[in-house]
Amino acid sequence: MAASGEARRVLVYGGRGALGSRCVQAFRARNWWVASIDVVENEEASASVVVKMTDSFTEQADQVTADVGKLLGDQKVDAILCVAGGWAGGNAKSKSLFKNCDMMWKQSMWTSTISSHLATKHLKEGGLLTLAGAKAALDGTPGMIGYGMAKGAVHQLCQSLAGKNSGMPPGAAAIAVLPVTLDTPMNRKSMPEADFSSWTPLEFLVETFHDWITGNKRPNSGSLIQVVTTDGKTELTPAYF
């Protein structure tokens, strides 16, 4: 980890999404160097890697890996925050099952896998990799098959990265955050009648990431951290199996 007061360097995968944009803004405001990785550029970031859309995972993974390599050279980063993702519903009978499963896999597992590989190449010793899981995927998700499968795979990946000989740098931590619902403009628009006091503010996760990057209250590598908000109060609770 960087010395106290030293400017950090962070990659935000999904840096133009609701949470990713907030991470970029908050860490740039602290004068950190922040690069965004997304399908469109984030002009507020120190640098952007634009992901080319393709149906080939290997093509996309190779493109992002190469472009990040050109951007960083031999510079290491303190953290890689994978906050890319999305949501789609549908049970196993749904006409949109295959389309939604494909979309969920691309948004969650492609991004998480690429982020994990980037961590092996560019993360500092003692650095932080965060992945975007989901509390719902700790159990069956019959009404959102594709979403549950993809998030369940993210959880498994996180635990694998914490194991011996995973390829992660010495002392580095892989941690998955498992929220219920994030308080984003898109979610408010799609669920205007919902109880917003049970939704997690984006600022809470941004500050949580800041704590973990700076070594404050960082959970053990492999932790699946449930993020639950009740009556406007958010708590972090590890999931155990």
Swiss-Prot record:
Active site residues of this protein: Y147 (proton acceptor)
Q: What is its EC number?
A: 1.5.1.34
Q: Which InterPro entries match?
A: NAD(P)-bd_dom_sf, Sc_DH/Rdtase_CS, SDR_fam
Gene giving rise to this polypeptide = Qdpr
Note the superkingdom of the native organism: Eukaryota
Q: Where are the transmembrane segments?
A: none
- Catalyzed chemical reaction(s): 5,6,7,8-tetrahydropteridine + NAD(+) = 6,7-dihydropteridine + NADH + H(+); 5,6,7,8-tetrahydropteridine + NADP(+) = 6,7-dihydropteridine + NADPH + H(+)
GO biological process terms, alphabetically, are: tetrahydrobiopterin biosynthetic process
Sequence similarity: Belongs to the short-chain dehydrogenases/reductases (SDR) family.
- Residues with PTM N6-succinyllysine: K70, K76, K93, K99
Q: What does the subunit comment say?
A: Homodimer.
The UniProt annotation places NADP(+) binding at 11-35
A Gene Ontology term for the protein's cellular component: mitochondrion
Q: Which PANTHER family is this protein grouped with? A: DIHYDROPTERIDINE REDUCTASE
Q: Which residues form a coiled coil?
A: none
Q: What is this protein called?
A: Dihydropteridine reductase
Q: What does the protein in this record do? A: Catalyzes the conversion of quinonoid dihydrobiopterin into tetrahydrobiopterin.
| Molecular function (Gene Ontology), one example | 6,7-dihydropteridine reductase activity
Q: Which organism is it from?
A: Mus musculus (Mouse)
Which keywords describe this protein according to UniProt? NADP, Oxidoreductase, Tetrahydrobiopterin biosynthesis
